[in-house]
A protein has these predicted regions:
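Short, Lys/Arg-enriched N-terminal segments with co-localized hydrophobic residues
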Residues: 1-13
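Interaction-mediating elements
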Residues: 13-143
Length: 143
């Protein structure tokens, strides 16, 4: 893949991670959630080192509403929502391994119930990214 003046960019890199949870967790807890997700992105999905872009948002109880029993999964107030926007192209098996790695990591390190880990992957074409400078770094220059 020719990326113009950014030859080291990989087509599958650049996840943007949004983490939403109820307010009241410590800074250390929120930081650990971000680190666990980042490690799973590195280890399972092959995201390059330092490709870390996360937005962690706390919400009041009225600002985070969800069905507590949808699909037979019993969620508590500790439920966290992970929305990860990333380039298209990963297999279903790889995605399933990623979901498991995140849920396992959050359970093992933070004692978060696996039922309280809600993950949504949003896949986009590579031209939908601008890392700054008003440029689409994954797209070959047309000039």
């Amino acid at each position: 893949m020719d990326t113009g003046r950014y030859p080291r960019l990989k087509e599958r890199s650049m996840p943007l991670v949004r983490i939403d949870l109820l307010e009241g967790k410590t800074l250390e807890y929120r930081t650990q959630v971000g680190e666990i997700v980042y490690q799973a992105l590195l280890g399972v999905l092959g995201v390059p080192n330092r490709d870390r872009f996360q937005v962690i948002t706390e919400h009041p109880k009225a600002g985070l509403q969800f069905d507590r029993d949808y699909l037979g999964v019993h969620r508590s107030d500790d439920c966290i929502f992970l929305q990860i926007t990333l380039n298209s192209g990963r297999t279903v098996e790889l995605k399933q391994r990623f979901y498991q790695a995140v849920a396992d990591g959050l359970h093992e390190r933070l004692k978060l119930r696996r039922e309280d880990v809600f993950i949504s992957l949003v896949e986009v074409p590579k031209e939908n990214w601008s890392f700054g400078n008003g440029e689409a770094q994954y797209v070959s220059p047309t000039r």
